[in-house]
Amino acid sequence: MANLVKEANEQLKEVIMKAMGMAVADGKFEPVPLPPFTIEIPNDKSHGDFAANVAMVCAKALKMNPRQIATILMERMIFDGTYFERCEMAGPGFLNF
């Protein structure tokens, strides 16, 4: 089970980083160094199987509202070949998968 969780976490990190790269290429994000973000399993299952705080921790570096960052990322996420089908935004900018 631990290997499955680790693999899913790595898949999400890759999906997010590719979406970030696409957003930079599209001119939506500035190409600036970004702080580390976390992907975790939420205690409340209504928050999805996994949650990422990437939009909130990158808000200062990107000089954007976290919800705007989350929206831009969600529009560019490709889940082909992963365990995941979709992403939803919650609260101040969490990405729930």
Where are these regions (language model features)?
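N-terminal alpha-helical targeting/anchoring segments
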Residues: 1-96
